[in-house]
Amino acid sequence: MTTLTTSSARTFTGDRDHSSFGFAVRHMTVSMFRGSFGDVDARVVIADDGAVELTGAVRVESISVQSPADLRAHLLGADFFDAATHPEITFRSAPARPAADGSIEVHGDLTMRGVSRPVVATGTLLGPVEDPFGATRAALELRATIDRREFGMTWNLPLPKGGDALGTQVELLVHLELVAD
């Protein structure tokens, strides 16, 4: 594996066809419910000193879940993402420096439902490589855990023998394939 190095600042744009933003949350205390957003917009700037800065957004309406349409509608509604009022989820990072092995810790602000909170994501920066068509590509894979209640997502139902139908800790999974501008 090589780490991303540059001789001058470079901007990389997310390849929408090869990038994803997913989430997973405990369901009925025994399984994980997973979903993703298909419309991911990301930009990564690699500074001369190797510092990495990420800005990104996803369109909430692009949510995809392996569930009935009424559940998708519930997720898009006011109990969860409130897509009509808040159509985007955004993230803006502070500069971060990858380690020699490509591992990286990214600190930034995540905004959902009009609420911004600091988030720390960990992951890996891979590349660069030249693709068969002459473009320079890299990848950024990140994971973070948030408490959905901090973003106003408090909906839940109690289970008959204790516990809640939906967990509060949500794992965010970001996979960005990046193309140099």
Model-derived regions, located:
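Low-complexity, acidic/polar, glycine-enriched regions of mature
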Residues: M1-D181
